A protein has these predicted regions:
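A cross-family "folded-core" feature that marks the main globular domain of proteins
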Residues: 1-125
Length: 125
């Protein structure tokens, strides 16, 4: 039932068709599974940070599957995030590898940076 509700939420918020909705929902669940396995934690799905992560994943997946990735602009900030949050960046790398392998899509440095920030927040919550 939770999966069915999630499908309707994604559909309502992103205004996508059923196949796109299923693709996005499946993608989000697989990313969450990667995160849980990487950190070996149970995520607090009631937390504000988890809610923000889910919102990020919804729009991230929509950009990804419509080939509208963000442009790399602030390389210094990207480097700082990568260096200061190396463990979380490692999780983002796992997600990047999954996306490349399953969908043959690449992530920009900016997408990696934002993903890393969200991963840091949910992994310490």
């Amino acid at each position: 039932e939770a999966g069915f509700i999630a499908l309707h939420i994604v559909n309502a918020e992103l205004d996508t068709n059923m196949s796109g909705m299923i693709k996005i929902t499946t993608f989000m669940q697989e990313v969450i599974d990667i995160v849980k396995n990487y950190y070996n934690i149970v995520l607090n799905e009631d937390s504000l940070d988890f809610g923000r992560f889910i919102t990020h994943l919804k729009y991230f997946s929509q950009r990804l599957f419509s080939n509208k990735s963000t442009k790399d602009t602030d390389f210094q900030l990207q480097r700082m995030i990568r260096e200061n949050y190396s463990k979380d960046y490692g999780c983002a790398e796992k997600i990047k590898e999954y996306i490349k392998e399953k969908y043959n899509l690449n992530l920009t440095g900016e997408e990696m940076m934002f993903l890393t920030i969200h991963l840091k927040r949910i992994s310490t919550n």
